[in-house]
Protein backbone atom coordinates (compact mmCIF):
# COMPACT_ATOMS: atom_id res chain seq x y z
CA UNK A 1 0.00 0.00 0.00
CA UNK A 2 2.83 2.36 0.98
CA UNK A 3 4.65 1.52 -2.24
CA UNK A 4 1.57 2.37 -4.28
CA UNK A 5 1.12 5.69 -2.46
CA UNK A 6 4.78 6.53 -2.95
CA UNK A 7 4.55 5.72 -6.65
CA UNK A 8 1.45 7.91 -7.03
CA UNK A 9 3.15 10.85 -5.30
CA UNK A 10 6.23 10.56 -7.47
CA UNK A 11 4.07 10.37 -10.57
CA UNK A 12 2.17 13.48 -9.51
CA UNK A 13 5.42 15.41 -8.86
CA UNK A 14 6.81 14.37 -12.22
CA UNK A 15 3.63 15.47 -13.98
CA UNK A 16 3.57 18.83 -12.19
CA UNK A 17 7.23 19.39 -13.00
CA UNK A 18 6.65 18.59 -16.67
CA UNK A 19 3.54 20.76 -16.95
CA UNK A 20 5.07 23.73 -15.06
CA UNK A 21 6.72 24.82 -18.33
CA UNK A 22 3.32 25.68 -19.86
CA UNK A 23 1.07 28.68 -19.35
CA UNK A 24 -2.12 27.94 -17.31
CA UNK A 25 -4.22 29.08 -20.27
CA UNK A 26 -2.57 26.47 -22.49
CA UNK A 27 -3.23 23.75 -19.93
CA UNK A 28 -6.87 24.80 -19.79
CA UNK A 29 -7.30 25.01 -23.57
CA UNK A 30 -5.49 21.78 -24.46
CA UNK A 31 -8.16 19.32 -23.27
CA UNK A 32 -10.91 21.44 -24.80
CA UNK A 33 -9.13 21.51 -28.15
CA UNK A 34 -8.48 17.77 -27.91
CA UNK A 35 -12.18 17.20 -27.25
CA UNK A 36 -13.12 19.42 -30.21
CA UNK A 37 -10.69 17.54 -32.47
CA UNK A 38 -12.07 14.20 -31.32
CA UNK A 39 -15.64 15.28 -31.99
CA UNK A 40 -14.67 16.61 -35.43
CA UNK A 41 -12.93 13.35 -36.32
CA UNK A 42 -15.93 11.37 -35.05
CA UNK A 43 -18.34 13.48 -37.12
CA UNK A 44 -16.12 13.12 -40.20
CA UNK A 45 -15.88 9.36 -39.75
CA UNK A 46 -19.67 9.12 -39.34
CA UNK A 47 -20.23 11.24 -42.47
CA UNK A 48 -17.88 9.04 -44.50
CA UNK A 49 -19.58 5.90 -43.18
CA UNK A 50 -23.03 7.25 -44.10
CA UNK A 51 -22.36 8.98 -47.42
CA UNK A 52 -19.06 7.58 -48.67
CA UNK A 53 -15.65 9.25 -48.89
CA UNK A 54 -16.19 10.50 -52.45
CA UNK A 55 -19.45 12.25 -51.61
CA UNK A 56 -18.02 13.89 -48.49
CA UNK A 57 -14.89 15.14 -50.29
CA UNK A 58 -17.03 16.45 -53.15
CA UNK A 59 -19.29 18.34 -50.73
CA UNK A 60 -16.26 19.89 -49.03
CA UNK A 61 -14.78 20.86 -52.39
CA UNK A 62 -18.04 22.48 -53.53
CA UNK A 63 -18.31 24.38 -50.26
CA UNK A 64 -14.76 25.69 -50.73
CA UNK A 65 -15.41 26.66 -54.37
CA UNK A 66 -18.54 28.62 -53.40
CA UNK A 67 -16.40 30.74 -51.06
CA UNK A 68 -14.43 32.11 -54.01
CA UNK A 69 -15.39 35.69 -55.02
CA UNK A 70 -18.22 35.76 -57.56
CA UNK A 71 -18.78 32.00 -57.64
CA UNK A 72 -21.78 31.97 -55.32
CA UNK A 73 -23.48 34.80 -57.24
CA UNK A 74 -22.89 32.99 -60.54
CA UNK A 75 -24.34 29.74 -59.19
CA UNK A 76 -27.42 31.55 -57.86
CA UNK A 77 -27.98 33.20 -61.25
CA UNK A 78 -27.73 29.85 -63.03
CA UNK A 79 -30.14 28.29 -60.55
CA UNK A 80 -32.59 31.09 -61.29
CA UNK A 81 -32.39 30.30 -65.01
CA UNK A 82 -33.13 26.62 -64.38
CA UNK A 83 -36.10 27.44 -62.13
CA UNK A 84 -37.47 29.83 -64.77
CA UNK A 85 -37.12 27.11 -67.42
CA UNK A 86 -38.90 24.59 -65.21
CA UNK A 87 -41.75 27.06 -64.79
CA UNK A 88 -41.95 27.92 -68.47
CA UNK A 89 -44.68 25.31 -68.95
CA UNK A 90 -47.09 27.40 -66.91
CA UNK A 91 -46.56 25.73 -63.54
CA UNK A 92 -46.67 29.00 -61.66
CA UNK A 93 -49.83 31.12 -61.57
CA UNK A 94 -48.66 33.69 -59.03
CA UNK A 95 -49.06 36.58 -61.46
CA UNK A 96 -52.81 35.94 -61.81
CA UNK A 97 -53.64 35.05 -58.23
CA UNK A 98 -56.49 36.77 -56.43
CA UNK A 99 -54.78 38.40 -53.43
CA UNK A 100 -57.72 40.09 -51.68
CA UNK A 101 -61.31 39.30 -50.86
CA UNK A 102 -63.77 40.78 -53.37
CA UNK A 103 -65.34 43.96 -52.01
CA UNK A 104 -68.76 42.54 -52.73
CA UNK A 105 -69.28 38.81 -52.51
CA UNK A 106 -69.64 37.03 -55.86
CA UNK A 107 -72.46 34.76 -54.73
CA UNK A 108 -73.22 32.00 -57.26
CA UNK A 109 -70.86 33.61 -59.76
CA UNK A 110 -68.06 31.71 -58.02
CA UNK A 111 -69.26 28.50 -59.71
CA UNK A 112 -68.75 30.09 -63.13
CA UNK A 113 -65.30 31.26 -62.04
CA UNK A 114 -64.42 27.76 -60.87
CA UNK A 115 -65.55 26.30 -64.18
CA UNK A 116 -63.37 28.82 -66.03
CA UNK A 117 -60.34 27.86 -63.94
CA UNK A 118 -61.04 24.18 -64.35
CA UNK A 119 -61.23 24.55 -68.12
CA UNK A 120 -57.57 25.59 -68.12
CA UNK A 121 -56.45 22.20 -66.78
CA UNK A 122 -54.85 19.84 -69.26
CA UNK A 123 -56.88 17.05 -70.81
CA UNK A 124 -56.10 14.35 -68.24
CA UNK A 125 -58.49 11.63 -69.41
CA UNK A 126 -56.41 8.61 -70.33
CA UNK A 127 -53.18 10.56 -70.82
CA UNK A 128 -51.74 10.66 -67.31
CA UNK A 129 -49.56 8.11 -65.55
CA UNK A 130 -51.56 7.28 -62.42
CA UNK A 131 -53.14 10.56 -61.27
CA UNK A 132 -56.79 9.65 -61.97
CA UNK A 133 -57.66 6.03 -61.31
CA UNK A 134 -61.43 6.06 -61.95
CA UNK A 135 -62.72 5.41 -65.47
CA UNK A 136 -64.92 7.79 -67.41
CA UNK A 137 -65.94 11.39 -66.84
CA UNK A 138 -65.99 13.10 -63.44
CA UNK A 139 -69.67 13.93 -63.89
CA UNK A 140 -71.04 10.41 -64.24
CA UNK A 141 -70.81 6.81 -63.06
CA UNK A 142 -68.53 6.04 -60.13
CA UNK A 143 -67.33 9.65 -60.00
CA UNK A 144 -70.87 10.90 -59.50
CA UNK A 145 -71.55 8.31 -56.80
CA UNK A 146 -68.56 9.16 -54.60
CA UNK A 147 -69.12 12.89 -55.15
CA UNK A 148 -72.69 12.53 -53.88
CA UNK A 149 -71.48 10.54 -50.86
CA UNK A 150 -68.94 13.27 -50.14
CA UNK A 151 -71.50 16.06 -50.38
CA UNK A 152 -73.82 14.24 -47.95
CA UNK A 153 -71.10 14.30 -45.27
CA UNK A 154 -69.10 17.40 -46.29
CA UNK A 155 -70.02 19.13 -43.01
CA UNK A 156 -68.89 16.29 -40.74
CA UNK A 157 -65.72 15.86 -38.71
CA UNK A 158 -64.76 12.60 -36.96
CA UNK A 159 -62.99 14.67 -34.31
CA UNK A 160 -66.47 15.12 -32.86
CA UNK A 161 -67.38 11.45 -32.46
CA UNK A 162 -70.18 12.27 -30.06
CA UNK A 163 -71.91 14.29 -32.80
CA UNK A 164 -71.02 12.45 -36.02
CA UNK A 165 -71.34 8.84 -34.93
CA UNK A 166 -72.11 7.83 -38.50
CA UNK A 167 -68.67 8.92 -39.70
CA UNK A 168 -66.95 7.03 -36.89
CA UNK A 169 -68.78 3.90 -37.98
CA UNK A 170 -67.91 4.47 -41.65
CA UNK A 171 -64.21 4.84 -40.83
CA UNK A 172 -64.23 1.71 -38.68
CA UNK A 173 -65.86 -0.25 -41.51
CA UNK A 174 -63.41 1.02 -44.15
CA UNK A 175 -60.49 0.00 -41.92
CA UNK A 176 -62.03 -3.40 -41.15
CA UNK A 177 -62.77 -4.17 -44.81
CA UNK A 178 -59.20 -3.25 -45.75
CA UNK A 179 -57.77 -5.37 -42.93
CA UNK A 180 -59.80 -8.30 -44.28
CA UNK A 181 -58.12 -7.86 -47.67
CA UNK A 182 -54.66 -7.81 -46.10
CA UNK A 183 -54.73 -10.88 -43.90
CA UNK A 184 -56.74 -10.42 -40.69
CA UNK A 185 -58.70 -13.61 -41.38
CA UNK A 186 -55.50 -15.65 -41.66
CA UNK A 187 -54.26 -17.25 -38.46
CA UNK A 188 -50.69 -16.23 -39.18
CA UNK A 189 -51.63 -12.54 -38.93
CA UNK A 190 -52.62 -12.83 -35.27
CA UNK A 191 -56.16 -11.57 -35.98
CA UNK A 192 -55.66 -8.20 -34.24
CA UNK A 193 -55.02 -5.93 -37.22
CA UNK A 194 -56.19 -2.37 -36.54
CA UNK A 195 -55.66 1.09 -38.01
CA UNK A 196 -56.99 4.47 -39.06
CA UNK A 197 -57.81 6.47 -42.15
CA UNK A 198 -55.43 9.25 -43.16
CA UNK A 199 -55.19 12.00 -45.77
CA UNK A 200 -52.97 10.02 -48.14
CA UNK A 201 -50.04 7.67 -48.50
CA UNK A 202 -47.54 10.17 -47.12
CA UNK A 203 -49.47 10.64 -43.87
CA UNK A 204 -49.91 6.88 -43.56
CA UNK A 205 -46.16 6.45 -43.96
CA UNK A 206 -45.36 9.29 -41.55
CA UNK A 207 -47.59 7.71 -38.92
CA UNK A 208 -46.13 4.23 -39.42
CA UNK A 209 -42.59 5.59 -39.01
CA UNK A 210 -43.48 7.71 -35.97
CA UNK A 211 -45.29 4.78 -34.39
CA UNK A 212 -42.39 2.40 -35.02
CA UNK A 213 -39.97 4.91 -33.50
CA UNK A 214 -41.98 5.34 -30.31
CA UNK A 215 -42.79 1.63 -30.06
CA UNK A 216 -39.13 0.66 -30.30
CA UNK A 217 -38.13 3.36 -27.83
CA UNK A 218 -40.54 1.84 -25.32
CA UNK A 219 -39.63 -1.75 -26.16
CA UNK A 220 -35.85 -1.50 -26.56
CA UNK A 221 -34.90 1.94 -25.25
CA UNK A 222 -33.65 3.19 -28.64
CA UNK A 223 -33.06 6.95 -28.50
CA UNK A 224 -31.04 7.43 -31.71
CA UNK A 225 -33.35 5.67 -34.17
CA UNK A 226 -32.36 4.46 -37.62
CA UNK A 227 -34.43 2.94 -40.41
CA UNK A 228 -33.31 0.94 -43.42
CA UNK A 229 -34.86 1.56 -46.83
CA UNK A 230 -34.06 0.61 -50.41
CA UNK A 231 -33.14 3.46 -52.72
CA UNK A 232 -36.40 2.67 -54.56
CA UNK A 233 -38.51 3.34 -51.45
CA UNK A 234 -40.88 6.30 -51.66
CA UNK A 235 -39.52 9.75 -50.80
CA UNK A 236 -42.10 9.98 -48.00
CA UNK A 237 -39.68 7.96 -45.84
CA UNK A 238 -37.08 10.71 -46.20
CA UNK A 239 -39.75 13.21 -45.22
CA UNK A 240 -40.58 11.12 -42.14
CA UNK A 241 -36.89 10.90 -41.24
CA UNK A 242 -36.58 14.70 -41.40
CA UNK A 243 -39.75 15.26 -39.40
CA UNK A 244 -38.99 12.72 -36.68
CA UNK A 245 -35.19 12.94 -36.45
CA UNK A 246 -34.50 9.43 -37.71
CA UNK A 247 -31.32 8.41 -39.50
CA UNK A 248 -31.88 6.79 -42.90
CA UNK A 249 -29.68 3.97 -44.10
CA UNK A 250 -30.33 3.73 -47.82
CA UNK A 251 -29.43 0.45 -49.53
CA UNK A 252 -28.91 0.18 -53.32
CA UNK A 253 -31.28 -2.19 -55.10
CA UNK A 254 -29.96 -5.46 -56.47
CA UNK A 255 -29.60 -6.43 -60.15
CA UNK A 256 -33.34 -7.15 -60.30
CA UNK A 257 -34.07 -3.64 -58.92
CA UNK A 258 -35.42 -5.14 -55.69
CA UNK A 259 -34.50 -4.43 -52.06
CA UNK A 260 -31.16 -6.13 -51.35
CA UNK A 261 -31.80 -8.29 -48.28
CA UNK A 262 -28.08 -8.87 -47.65
CA UNK A 263 -27.50 -5.13 -47.83
CA UNK A 264 -30.31 -4.57 -45.33
CA UNK A 265 -28.78 -7.12 -42.97
CA UNK A 266 -25.40 -5.35 -43.05
CA UNK A 267 -27.08 -2.10 -41.95
CA UNK A 268 -28.87 -3.52 -38.90
CA UNK A 269 -27.42 -2.37 -35.58
CA UNK A 270 -28.52 -1.57 -32.04
CA UNK A 271 -30.27 1.64 -33.18
CA UNK A 272 -32.34 0.08 -35.97
CA UNK A 273 -36.06 0.55 -35.35
CA UNK A 274 -37.50 -0.56 -38.68
CA UNK A 275 -37.06 -1.67 -42.27
CA UNK A 276 -39.26 -0.84 -45.26
CA UNK A 277 -40.36 -3.08 -48.13
CA UNK A 278 -42.49 -1.95 -51.06
CA UNK A 279 -45.25 -3.93 -52.79
CA UNK A 280 -44.76 -2.64 -55.35
CA UNK A 281 -42.19 0.16 -55.39
CA UNK A 282 -43.31 3.35 -57.09
CA UNK A 283 -40.45 3.62 -59.63
CA UNK A 284 -40.50 0.21 -61.31
CA UNK A 285 -43.64 -1.59 -60.08
CA UNK A 286 -41.66 -4.43 -58.49
CA UNK A 287 -42.48 -6.23 -55.23
CA UNK A 288 -39.59 -6.39 -52.76
CA UNK A 289 -38.82 -9.76 -51.10
CA UNK A 290 -41.19 -9.17 -48.18
CA UNK A 291 -40.85 -12.70 -46.78
CA UNK A 292 -37.07 -12.43 -46.53
CA UNK A 293 -37.30 -8.98 -44.97
CA UNK A 294 -39.86 -10.40 -42.52
CA UNK A 295 -37.40 -13.10 -41.49
CA UNK A 296 -34.78 -10.42 -40.81
CA UNK A 297 -37.25 -8.31 -38.83
CA UNK A 298 -38.26 -11.30 -36.70
CA UNK A 299 -34.68 -12.40 -36.10
CA UNK A 300 -33.52 -8.96 -34.94
CA UNK A 301 -36.82 -8.00 -33.26
CA UNK A 302 -37.38 -4.80 -35.26
CA UNK A 303 -40.38 -3.40 -37.12
CA UNK A 304 -41.11 -4.04 -40.79
CA UNK A 305 -43.38 -1.67 -42.69
CA UNK A 306 -44.81 -2.73 -46.04
CA UNK A 307 -45.65 0.08 -48.45
CA UNK A 308 -48.83 -1.06 -50.20
CA UNK A 309 -49.94 2.44 -51.17
CA UNK A 310 -50.07 1.38 -54.82
CA UNK A 311 -50.73 -2.33 -54.39
CA UNK A 312 -53.23 -2.59 -51.56
CA UNK A 313 -56.30 -2.62 -53.80
CA UNK A 314 -54.75 -4.60 -56.66
CA UNK A 315 -52.52 -7.36 -55.31
CA UNK A 316 -55.18 -9.19 -53.22
CA UNK A 317 -57.41 -9.42 -56.29
CA UNK A 318 -54.60 -10.16 -58.74
CA UNK A 319 -53.63 -13.08 -56.53
CA UNK A 320 -57.22 -14.38 -56.64
CA UNK A 321 -57.14 -14.04 -60.43
CA UNK A 322 -54.12 -16.35 -60.60
CA UNK A 323 -51.29 -13.90 -61.17
CA UNK A 324 -47.98 -14.99 -59.55
CA UNK A 325 -47.97 -12.52 -56.67
CA UNK A 326 -45.35 -13.11 -53.92
CA UNK A 327 -46.43 -12.74 -50.25
CA UNK A 328 -46.86 -9.10 -49.21
CA UNK A 329 -49.34 -8.66 -46.33
CA UNK A 330 -49.79 -9.40 -42.60
CA UNK A 331 -49.63 -13.14 -43.30
CA UNK A 332 -45.86 -12.64 -43.58
CA UNK A 333 -44.19 -13.12 -40.20
CA UNK A 334 -42.41 -9.95 -39.10
CA UNK A 335 -44.70 -7.40 -40.80
CA UNK A 336 -45.78 -4.86 -38.18
CA UNK A 337 -47.47 -2.16 -40.28
CA UNK A 338 -48.87 -1.51 -43.74
CA UNK A 339 -49.91 1.65 -45.61
CA UNK A 340 -52.41 1.48 -48.47
CA UNK A 341 -54.21 4.16 -50.44
CA UNK A 342 -57.93 3.94 -51.07
CA UNK A 343 -57.76 6.94 -53.40
CA UNK A 344 -55.68 5.03 -55.94
CA UNK A 345 -56.94 1.64 -57.06
CA UNK A 346 -59.56 1.66 -54.30
CA UNK A 347 -61.24 4.34 -56.49
CA UNK A 348 -62.10 6.59 -53.53
CA UNK A 349 -61.94 10.41 -53.47
CA UNK A 350 -58.48 11.99 -53.32
CA UNK A 351 -57.23 12.30 -49.77
CA UNK A 352 -58.06 8.82 -48.45
CA UNK A 353 -55.50 6.28 -47.26
CA UNK A 354 -55.19 3.75 -44.45
CA UNK A 355 -52.41 2.83 -42.04
CA UNK A 356 -52.71 -0.60 -40.41
CA UNK A 357 -50.83 -2.25 -37.55
CA UNK A 358 -50.39 -5.86 -36.55
CA UNK A 359 -51.94 -5.22 -33.13
CA UNK A 360 -53.23 -2.57 -30.73
CA UNK A 361 -50.06 -2.57 -28.65
CA UNK A 362 -48.16 -1.10 -31.59
CA UNK A 363 -50.92 1.28 -32.75
CA UNK A 364 -51.21 2.94 -29.33
CA UNK A 365 -47.84 4.60 -30.04
CA UNK A 366 -49.42 6.42 -32.98
CA UNK A 367 -51.78 8.44 -30.78
CA UNK A 368 -51.09 11.81 -29.16
CA UNK A 369 -52.70 12.37 -25.74
CA UNK A 370 -52.49 15.71 -23.92
CA UNK A 371 -53.51 15.95 -20.27
CA UNK A 372 -52.36 19.45 -19.20
CA UNK A 373 -54.15 21.67 -21.71
CA UNK A 374 -56.56 24.25 -20.29
CA UNK A 375 -58.88 23.38 -23.18
CA UNK A 376 -59.52 20.00 -21.60
CA UNK A 377 -58.28 16.47 -22.13
CA UNK A 378 -57.23 15.85 -25.74
CA UNK A 379 -56.38 12.75 -27.74
CA UNK A 380 -55.93 12.45 -31.50
CA UNK A 381 -55.29 9.34 -33.61
CA UNK A 382 -53.64 10.91 -36.69
CA UNK A 383 -51.57 13.95 -37.66
CA UNK A 384 -54.65 16.01 -38.48
CA UNK A 385 -57.02 16.95 -35.69
CA UNK A 386 -60.08 17.87 -37.71
CA UNK A 387 -60.63 15.54 -40.65
CA UNK A 388 -63.14 15.70 -43.52
CA UNK A 389 -65.89 13.21 -42.89
CA UNK A 390 -66.95 13.57 -46.53
CA UNK A 391 -63.78 11.80 -47.66
CA UNK A 392 -64.42 8.92 -45.26
CA UNK A 393 -67.97 8.60 -46.61
CA UNK A 394 -66.64 8.72 -50.17
CA UNK A 395 -64.17 5.90 -49.44
CA UNK A 396 -66.88 3.80 -47.82
CA UNK A 397 -69.19 4.40 -50.79
CA UNK A 398 -66.44 3.46 -53.25
CA UNK A 399 -65.58 0.20 -51.51
CA UNK A 400 -69.10 -0.99 -50.81
CA UNK A 401 -70.51 0.00 -54.20
CA UNK A 402 -67.80 -1.93 -56.05
CA UNK A 403 -67.61 -4.95 -53.76
CA UNK A 404 -65.36 -7.93 -54.34
CA UNK A 405 -66.76 -8.54 -57.83
CA UNK A 406 -66.16 -4.95 -58.90
CA UNK A 407 -62.56 -4.90 -57.72
CA UNK A 408 -61.90 -8.29 -59.31
CA UNK A 409 -63.25 -7.06 -62.63
CA UNK A 410 -61.29 -3.80 -62.52
CA UNK A 411 -58.08 -5.58 -61.53
CA UNK A 412 -58.50 -8.02 -64.40
CA UNK A 413 -58.80 -5.14 -66.87
CA UNK A 414 -55.81 -3.12 -65.68
CA UNK A 415 -53.55 -6.16 -65.22
CA UNK A 416 -54.35 -7.31 -68.76
CA UNK A 417 -53.67 -3.87 -70.24
CA UNK A 418 -50.47 -3.54 -68.18
CA UNK A 419 -49.14 -6.76 -69.70
CA UNK A 420 -50.10 -5.57 -73.18
CA UNK A 421 -48.27 -2.29 -72.61
CA UNK A 422 -45.23 -4.17 -71.29
CA UNK A 423 -45.12 -6.41 -74.37
CA UNK A 424 -45.71 -3.43 -76.65
CA UNK A 425 -42.78 -1.52 -75.14
CA UNK A 426 -40.53 -4.56 -75.45
CA UNK A 427 -41.41 -4.70 -79.16
CA UNK A 428 -40.23 -1.11 -79.78
CA UNK A 429 -36.60 -1.18 -81.02
CA UNK A 430 -34.35 0.75 -78.66
CA UNK A 431 -36.49 0.41 -75.54
CA UNK A 432 -36.28 -2.07 -72.67
CA UNK A 433 -38.52 -2.73 -69.67
CA UNK A 434 -36.88 -2.43 -66.25
CA UNK A 435 -37.16 -5.59 -64.18
CA UNK A 436 -40.19 -7.86 -64.33
CA UNK A 437 -43.24 -5.75 -63.40
CA UNK A 438 -45.47 -7.47 -60.84
CA UNK A 439 -48.42 -5.16 -61.14
CA UNK A 440 -49.58 -2.11 -63.08
CA UNK A 441 -46.47 0.06 -63.21
CA UNK A 442 -44.24 -0.42 -66.27
CA UNK A 443 -40.87 1.36 -66.29
CA UNK A 444 -38.74 1.54 -69.40
CA UNK A 445 -35.44 2.99 -70.56
CA UNK A 446 -33.21 3.04 -73.62
CA UNK A 447 -29.61 2.38 -74.56
CA UNK A 448 -29.92 4.04 -77.96
CA UNK A 449 -31.85 7.29 -77.43
CA UNK A 450 -32.16 9.92 -74.70
CA UNK A 451 -35.28 8.71 -72.86
CA UNK A 452 -35.95 12.21 -71.53
CA UNK A 453 -36.06 13.53 -75.10
CA UNK A 454 -38.61 10.80 -75.81
CA UNK A 455 -40.57 12.06 -72.81
CA UNK A 456 -40.56 15.61 -74.20
CA UNK A 457 -42.01 14.36 -77.49
CA UNK A 458 -44.63 12.35 -75.59
CA UNK A 459 -45.49 15.47 -73.57
CA UNK A 460 -46.04 17.39 -76.79
CA UNK A 461 -48.59 14.70 -77.71
CA UNK A 462 -50.46 15.28 -74.43
CA UNK A 463 -49.00 12.43 -72.35
CA UNK A 464 -47.87 12.93 -68.76
CA UNK A 465 -45.39 10.23 -67.75
CA UNK A 466 -43.10 9.97 -64.72
CA UNK A 467 -39.40 10.64 -65.24
CA UNK A 468 -37.10 8.41 -63.18
CA UNK A 469 -33.38 8.25 -62.44
CA UNK A 470 -30.77 5.57 -61.72
CA UNK A 471 -31.22 4.49 -64.43
CA UNK A 472 -32.70 7.28 -66.53
CA UNK A 473 -36.13 5.99 -67.46
CA UNK A 474 -39.87 6.67 -67.63
CA UNK A 475 -42.83 4.84 -66.26
CA UNK A 476 -46.54 4.62 -66.81
CA UNK A 477 -48.84 3.70 -63.95
CA UNK A 478 -51.76 1.99 -65.68
CA UNK A 479 -55.28 2.85 -64.52
CA UNK A 480 -58.79 2.23 -65.78
CA UNK A 481 -58.38 5.41 -67.82
CA UNK A 482 -55.83 3.60 -70.00
CA UNK A 483 -57.87 0.52 -70.82
CA UNK A 484 -59.47 2.24 -73.83
CA UNK A 485 -56.44 4.22 -75.00
CA UNK A 486 -53.39 2.01 -74.49
CA UNK A 487 -52.98 1.31 -78.21
CA UNK A 488 -52.70 5.07 -78.85
CA UNK A 489 -50.07 5.23 -76.08
CA UNK A 490 -47.94 2.53 -77.70
CA UNK A 491 -48.25 4.14 -81.15
CA UNK A 492 -47.27 7.57 -79.80
CA UNK A 493 -44.38 6.05 -77.88
CA UNK A 494 -43.00 4.29 -80.97
CA UNK A 495 -43.41 7.46 -83.04
CA UNK A 496 -41.62 9.48 -80.32
CA UNK A 497 -38.67 7.06 -80.25
CA UNK A 498 -38.44 7.20 -84.05
CA UNK A 499 -38.53 11.01 -83.93
CA UNK A 500 -35.66 11.18 -81.43
CA UNK A 501 -33.65 8.64 -83.46
CA UNK A 502 -34.11 10.76 -86.59
CA UNK A 503 -33.58 14.11 -84.85
CA UNK A 504 -31.59 13.63 -81.63
CA UNK A 505 -31.28 16.60 -79.35
CA UNK A 506 -33.56 18.60 -77.06
CA UNK A 507 -36.71 20.24 -78.37
CA UNK A 508 -37.55 23.86 -77.65
CA UNK A 509 -39.01 24.20 -74.19
CA UNK A 510 -38.29 20.57 -73.35
CA UNK A 511 -36.97 19.45 -69.99
CA UNK A 512 -34.64 16.70 -71.19
CA UNK A 513 -31.47 18.80 -70.64
CA UNK A 514 -32.52 19.61 -67.08
CA UNK A 515 -33.38 16.02 -66.19
CA UNK A 516 -30.22 14.75 -67.84
CA UNK A 517 -27.99 17.29 -66.11
CA UNK A 518 -29.63 16.68 -62.73
CA UNK A 519 -28.98 12.96 -63.02
CA UNK A 520 -25.30 13.48 -63.81
CA UNK A 521 -24.65 16.33 -61.35
CA UNK A 522 -22.29 14.95 -58.66
CA UNK A 523 -23.18 17.64 -56.12
CA UNK A 524 -26.58 16.36 -54.93
CA UNK A 525 -26.82 19.31 -52.55
CA UNK A 526 -27.01 21.57 -55.59
CA UNK A 527 -29.86 19.48 -57.01
CA UNK A 528 -31.66 19.74 -53.69
CA UNK A 529 -31.27 23.54 -53.71
CA UNK A 530 -32.76 23.66 -57.21
CA UNK A 531 -35.76 21.65 -56.09
CA UNK A 532 -36.32 23.91 -53.08
CA UNK A 533 -36.00 27.05 -55.22
CA UNK A 534 -38.49 25.63 -57.72
CA UNK A 535 -41.01 24.73 -55.02
CA UNK A 536 -40.63 28.11 -53.31
CA UNK A 537 -41.34 29.85 -56.60
CA UNK A 538 -44.30 27.60 -57.41
CA UNK A 539 -46.45 27.76 -54.30
UniProtKB/Swiss-Prot annotation:
| UniProt xrefs under InterPro entries | GrpII_AminoAcid_Decarb (IPR050477), PyrdxlP-dep_de-COase (IPR002129), PyrdxlP-dep_Trfase (IPR015424), PyrdxlP-dep_Trfase_major (IPR015421), PyrdxlP-dep_Trfase_small (IPR015422)
E.C. number: 4.1.2.27
> Pathway involvement?
Lipid metabolism; sphingolipid metabolism
What is one term from the GO cellular component aspect held by the record? endoplasmic reticulum
Instruction: Give the primary localization class.
Output: endoplasmic reticulum
Q: Describe the task this protein carries out.
A: Cleaves phosphorylated sphingoid bases (PSBs), such as sphingosine-1-phosphate, into fatty aldehydes and phosphoethanolamine. Elevates stress-induced ceramide production and apoptosis.
Q: What is this protein called?
A: Sphingosine-1-phosphate lyase
Amino acid sequence: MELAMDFALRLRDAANHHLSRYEPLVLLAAPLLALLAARTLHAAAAAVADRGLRTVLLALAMTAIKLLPGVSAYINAEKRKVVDQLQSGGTSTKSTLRTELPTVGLSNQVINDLETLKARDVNWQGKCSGTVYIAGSESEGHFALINKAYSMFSHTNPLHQDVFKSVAQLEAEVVAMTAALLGIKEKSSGGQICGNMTSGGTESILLAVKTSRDYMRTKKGITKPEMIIAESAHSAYDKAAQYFNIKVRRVPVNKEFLADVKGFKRCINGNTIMMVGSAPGFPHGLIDPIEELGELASRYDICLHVDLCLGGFVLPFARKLGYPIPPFDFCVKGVTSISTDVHKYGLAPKGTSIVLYKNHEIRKHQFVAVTEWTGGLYVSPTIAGSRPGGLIAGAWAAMTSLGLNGYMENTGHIMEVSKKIQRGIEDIPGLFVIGKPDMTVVAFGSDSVDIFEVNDIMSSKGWHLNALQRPNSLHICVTLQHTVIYEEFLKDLKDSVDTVKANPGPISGGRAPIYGAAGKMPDRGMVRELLVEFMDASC
